[in-house]
Regions:
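Single conserved hydrophobic/aromatic residue that forms the stacking wall/gate
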Residues: 1-6, 11
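A general, composition-driven signal for non-globular sequence regions
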Residues: 1-2, 23, 54, 73
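A structure-centric signal for secondary-structure junctions around beta-strands
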Residues: 4-6, 16, 119
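ATP/adenylate-binding site constellation spanning eukaryotic-like Ser/Thr protein kinases
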Residues: 6, 38, 127
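A short mixed-secondary-structure module that forms the rim of ligand-binding clefts
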Residues: 12-49
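Charged, gly/pro-rich active-site loop segments
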Residues: 51-157
Length: 157
């Protein structure tokens, strides 16, 4: 795990088993993934009682065609978090959004939002395996789908 708690991710390229998400290049997770691109992602649906764990290998994209394509599809209102002066997780003496006062509301243009591109990254995660766990009072069920070796297995929960 790379402390990706709360991040929403979308499967962007099903034929190649890729999950991708956006991050700030200054985020701690970037340095962690540079040192070790292997990560795990855990998803849980309380209503369905299903837990899914992905084991992935991550590639960090920054200032390349992949980031440019994703950036161009991002609404300018969503680009706001990449305009902060200091990186995510930087300690502050006061409550702050991290934005310059003139950007601390929604009154900025798409052109002004372009400044955030320098901090924008796309992390593409190649799924190596999927573990599925169904939690049931009558007995749990668990399976592993190994995408690297095309091998599926039932597991004891």
């Amino acid at each position: 795990s790379v402390r990706l708690v709360g991040s929403e991710m979308c499967i962007r390229d099903r034929s190649n088993n890729l999950v991708q998400f956006h991050s700030d290049i200054r985020s701690d997770k970037i340095e962690i993934l540079k040192k070790n691109p292997n990560a795990s992602m855990l998803f849980y649906d309380k209503d369905e009682k299903i837990q899914v764990r992905l084991k992935v290998n991550c590639v960090i994209n920054h200032k390349n065609e992949i980031t440019k394509t994703s950036w161009d599809k991002t609404q300018h209102i969503s680009r706001k978090c990449y305009l902060v002066d200091k990186g995510p997780g930087t300690v502050s003496d006061v409550p702050t959004s991290g934005l310059k006062p003139e950007l601390d509301n929604f009154d900025y243009t798409k052109e002004q939002s372009e400044e955030g591109y320098k901090n924008f990254t796309v992390i593409q995660c190649k799924i190596k395996s999927i573990e599925w766990l169904y939690l049931a009072a009558k007995g749990h069920r668990r399976a592993r789908f190994d995408l690297e070796n095309s091998k599926d297995s039932w597991l004891v929960p």
